[in-house]
């Protein structure tokens, strides 16, 4: 799997979990301390985020990092 494929898969998983929990993209971005447009880029696999940001998203979703990879 390429890096781009991993970023896309990660973003899809973030979106799946967010929607399953009934959280809007805007609300998740706010909870994770991320700009809403940046969160959209993450969900579309357009941003190669830091591990710190990944953990902030996980904390906001109340899940473990392995749930997204």
Task: Give the predicted meaning of each segment.
Residues 46-56, 65:
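Short, basic-rich loop-to-helix N-cap that marks the start of a DNA-contacting helix
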Residues 12-31, 56:
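Short basic helix-loop element that most often maps to the first helix and adjoining turn
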Residues 33-47:
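Recognition helix of helix-turn-helix/homeodomain-like DNA-binding domains
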Residues 8, 19-20, 48:
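Short amphipathic helical patch at the helix-1/turn junction of helix-turn-helix
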Residues 62-69:
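Short C-terminal boundary/hinge segments that cap the last helix of small helical domains
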Residues 14, 28-29, 39-42, 68:
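Conserved hydrophobic/aromatic packing and binding residues within compact polymer-binding modules
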Residues 1-9:
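A detector for short, charged/polar N-terminal pre-domain segments
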